Amino acid sequence: MSLPNPAELLPRMASDLRAHLAERGIERPRYVGIHTGGIWVAEALLKALGNEEPLGTLDVSFYRDDFTRNGLHPQVRPSALPFEIDGQHLVLVDDVLMSGRTIRAALNELFDYGRPASVTLVCLLDLNARELPIRPDVVGQTLSLGRDERVKLVGPAPLALERKVLSPAS
């Protein structure tokens, strides 16, 4: 199975997001990308939408429930939300939805900043491997991978997807 080209997924995602927001009567939502791939996808979506609003960024490293097992990422960055969260309609963007743990961590962090009116989840890929009941409202493509496979977004320009096969533990 070949991986999709993000540049081919993004125009449809932008159209689907526009329709999703209009259906709910949401105007001028605030956009938040999750480090790092989610920021790249959010920037591409904002460009496709012709939107020049500031982009908020989250690094959820300290909010992950598995960092004691996996360790802290060596490049923890500060989150930056250049707007109020309280009462805002947010569009939360990530590159790959797998277990749902990154999204759970992002929601926890967002609620530490305030109580949004709503959160719309947008993901470039849904790997259909959820451990938590989290589903994207807008998705570029859904894929099913083997247990030893992962997908990583590389970029920022051009955006591309790489498949990785995990090596067995020694």
Swiss-Prot record:
It catalyses: UMP + diphosphate = 5-phospho-alpha-D-ribose 1-diphosphate + uracil. SUPFAM superfamilies: PRTase-like. Keywords: Glycosyltransferase, Transcription, Transcription regulation, Transferase. Its EC number is 2.4.2.9. Pfam families: Pribosyltran. One of its GO terms (molecular function) is uracil phosphoribosyltransferase activity. It comes from the Bacteria. InterPro entries: PRibTrfase_dom, PRTase-like, PyrR, PyrR_bifunctional. One of its GO terms (biological process) is regulation of DNA-templated transcription. Gene3D superfamilies: 3.40.50.2020. A motif (PRPP-binding) lies at residues 90-102. Belongs to the purine/pyrimidine phosphoribosyltransferase family. PyrR subfamily. NCBIfam families: PRK05205.1-1. Regulates the transcription of the pyrimidine nucleotide (pyr) operon in response to exogenous pyrimidines. This is Bifunctional protein PyrR. It comes from Pseudomonas paraeruginosa (strain DSM 24068 / PA7).
